[in-house]
């Protein structure tokens, strides 16, 4: 029997209709895995050994009670076959410390999904810079004058922080926007923080597409997140609506161009954000949208993920 750990935000406050971590656990349970639930504060190091306070959990698809803890124990993380790191951002120093604990567990024999070093290496916004031919025209800088020059050159631009999630603090700045200086000051914290500027992709009205890649294989369906009326952000957290659809030829080309690098880096479950024919983000921490895609199409993304985990655990 495979023992699967999962590090996540409190299970008591998830929305089971939409939560991808819940979907993963359901599939693991269907396969007879023993599931060990953890939050970040359950991870520890003791003399270099990665240990954790875990709760064995059973799940059911019941909005009135979707989980039950069966036992509590302190274990070495290496006793688990695999651990899913599914904690949502913020990607702060605490998150980074947790990846070091998980890296010790990895060195002691557990498979960590996604690879701890790659979680640190691959910032969700910056990692797209490794694929400049696929992205909108982009600069990353702290200097207000550089952002202003970029906006003057390109007219209609998107400005965003490097650490936001769910569409937080994303600004569209058009020509002659009187607020451009204050937006730049806010995003860069008066030149103390890096910010990203990208040319605006008009195709956002057709949705910001979330494409899932499992172990280097792009899933054939995506979730297009359509912005609310008058919005430029498709994020569901910003009021967008999700519409599952098959990948277009361009979507597939983008995903196939990025997929080998992801696999090489031990990024087994990744969400690509694509607007029109441009890659805008590579989500490696806790990509979502599984539930919505699986509800619309006859595909088991979680099944593909567990297959990939089993292959690695068995050393295939």
UniProtKB/Swiss-Prot annotation:
4Fe-4S in keyword set: no
Binding-site list for ATP: 150-207
GO molecular function annotations of the record: ATP binding; glutathione synthase activity; metal ion binding
Protein's pathway: Sulfur metabolism; glutathione biosynthesis; glutathione from L-cysteine and L-glutamate: step 2/2
Keywords associated with the record: ATP-binding, Glutathione biosynthesis, Ligase, Magnesium, Manganese, Metal-binding, Nucleotide-binding
Residue span(s) of domain ATP-grasp: 124-310
Name of protein: Glutathione synthetase
Gene name, Swiss-Prot/TrEMBL: gshB
């Amino acid at each position: 029997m495979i023992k699967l750990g999962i590090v996540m935000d409190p299970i008591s406050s998830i929305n089971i209709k939409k939560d991808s971590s819940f979907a993963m656990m359901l599939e693991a349970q269907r396969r007879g895995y023993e599931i060990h639930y953890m939050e970040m504060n359950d991870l520890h190091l003791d003399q270099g050994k990665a240990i954790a306070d875990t709760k064995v959990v059973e799940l059911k698809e019941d909005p009135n009670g979707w989980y039950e803890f069966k036992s509590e124990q302190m274990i070495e993380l290496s006793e688990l076959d695999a651990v899913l790191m599914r904690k949502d951002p913020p990607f702060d120093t605490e998150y980074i410390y947790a990846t070091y604990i998980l890296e010790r567990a990895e060195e002691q024999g557990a498979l960590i999904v996604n690879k701890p070093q790659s979680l640190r290496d691959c910032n969700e916004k910056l990692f797209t810079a490794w694929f400049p031919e696929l992205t909108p025209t982009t600069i990353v800088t702290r200097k207000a004058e550089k952002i202003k020059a970029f906006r003057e050159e390109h007219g209609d631009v998107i400005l965003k922080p490097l650490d936001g999630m769910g569409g937080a603090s994303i600004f569209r700045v058009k020509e002659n926007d009187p607020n451009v200086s204050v937006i730049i000051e806010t995003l860069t914290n008066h030149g103390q923080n890096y910010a990203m500027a990208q040319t605006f992709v008009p195709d956002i009205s057709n949705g910001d597409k979330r494409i899932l890649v499992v172990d280097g294989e792009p899933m054939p369906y995506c979730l297009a997140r359509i912005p609310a009326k008058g919005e430029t952000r498709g994020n569901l957290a910003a009021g967008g609506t999700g519409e599952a659809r098959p990948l277009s030829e361009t979507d597939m080309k983008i995903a196939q161009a990025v997929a080998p690098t992801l696999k090489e880096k031990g990024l087994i479950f990744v969400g690509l954000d694509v607007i029109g024919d441009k890659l805008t983000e590579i989500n490696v921490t806790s990509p979502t949208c599984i539930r919505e895609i699986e509800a619309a199409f006859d595909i088991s993304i979680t099944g593909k993920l567990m297959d990939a985990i089993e292959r690695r655990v068995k050393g295939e």
